[in-house]
Structures are given as C-alpha cells and as structure tokens.
C-alpha cells in the first residue's frame, strides 16, 4: 500500500497544473482556398482574364518555411509565382518530406477563375507537422502570389476545430515589374520575399486581402 501511494504521489508531482499534452497521431482537415480578388475589391488597373493558379502547399513544423518575409525565393517558388506552375516546387516539397521536415504535399489541379471561387482539398497533419503553408499565383502578374504562411492548426497542444486565415498578395522578389501585364524584368540577384506593397493591393495604406483559406477538422 505504501509503495502504491508513493508512486501515485510521485506521478502527481510531475504534472504541472493546467498543462496540456500535445495530441498524438494524425488528423484530417478539409481545406478551402477562396478567391475574393476582383475588380470590386482591387479596382486599380484590374486585368482581363484574372485568375488564381492551382493551389500548392505543405504541412510542416517550425523548422521549415515555404514562404518567409525576408527570405530568398527558391526556384520552385519563383516558377509558381511567375508562371503558376507547380514544378519544381512540388519536387522541392517532396525532398523535404524525405528529410522529415515536411509532412505532406498539398495540391489542387484547376485554376480558380470565378469570383467568388474556391478550390478544395483534404490534408492530414500531425503533432510533428501541425502547420500549413499554402499559395496560388495571382495571374497575370510579374511574381505575385496569394499566400498563407505558417498557419498553425494546433493551439495549446490541441488541434483546432476550425480556422480561417486571410490570404494576402506577396511579392517574391524575382521580377522587378510593377504592373499586372508588364514584360519580364528578372531581378538579379533576387530581393527578399515580402507582402506586396503595390498600390494594387492597398487601400488607405493597408493591405486588402485577396482571399481566405478555411481549415475545418474532420
């Protein structure tokens, strides 16, 4: 009896009151990537045939960033945001899956041409890869993408039931052109990625979202 009581007291002393243990295993989210970017929301010089490219992203931990303000765009990010193509970014993400820094590749296959419009997919996250970074090219444009970077789906050690994150236009620093349909003007060397400060995406000095991404736990 004494040994059982001692074991129970020892266990209790190791638990910090109010602490929450991180969930183990994987959980699935329905991901809806919505476009709101339109002539009504962003009227300045709004282009004909405007659309978002198919969506690409990754689940990951804190030691990985698909997009990061101040970082230099990879070859894959450059091609996504200049041409709307997933290659070679998909290969870059798969290489990080092999290294363990990324949990899963996220992709949709069709552009988002209508407003309102959306693309939907499902993704699995786990305690080691509880974050999502996801993007689509804003097309036409020099090197601009609609981005949600480093969205954590785990709060206080628990996976959230639902989360909505605004999508903002990013300039990934690979093309110096400043208008939607400008000719290519490659930036060499590349300048750091940042949320776009183009007047196309500002109102009264503040960034206007181009969409949102909604995560719903299944």
PLM feature spans:
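Bacterial N-terminal signal peptides that target proteins for export
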Residues: 1-7
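A ubiquitous, low-specificity "background" feature that marks scattered single residues
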Residues: 8-9, 177
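Cleavable N-terminal signal peptides
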Residues: 9-10, 20
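Mature, soluble, non-transmembrane domains
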Residues: 95-218
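Structured domain cores in non-transmembrane regions
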Residues: 24-28, 37-145
């Amino acid at each position: 009896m004494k040994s059982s009581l001692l074991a129970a007291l020892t266990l209790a002393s190791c638990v910090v009151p109010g602490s929450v243990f991180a969930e183990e295993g994987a959980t699935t989210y329905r991901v809806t990537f919505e476009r709101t970017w339109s002539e009504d929301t962003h009227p300045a010089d709004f282009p004909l045939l405007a659309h978002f490219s198919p969506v690409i992203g990754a689940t990951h931990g804190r030691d990985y960033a698909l997009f990061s303000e101040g970082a230099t765009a990879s070859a894959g990010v450059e091609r996504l945001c200049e041409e709307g193509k997933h290659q070679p970014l998909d290969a870059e993400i798969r290489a990080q899956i092999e290294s363990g820094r990324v949990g899963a590749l996220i992709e949709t296959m069709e552009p988002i041409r209508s407003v309102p419009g959306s693309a939907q997919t499902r993704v699995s996250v786990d305690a080691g890869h509880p974050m999502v970074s996801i993007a689509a090219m804003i097309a036409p444009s020099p090197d601009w993408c609609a981005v949600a970077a480093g969205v954590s789906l785990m709060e206080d050690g628990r996976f959230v039931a639902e989360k909505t994150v605004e999508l903002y236009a990013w300039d990934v620093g690979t093309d110096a052109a400043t208008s939607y349909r400008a000719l290519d003007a490659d930036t060499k060397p590349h300048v750091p990625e940042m949320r776009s400060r183009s007047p196309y995406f500002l109102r009264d000095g503040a960034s206007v979202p181009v969409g949102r991404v909604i995560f719903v736990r299944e």
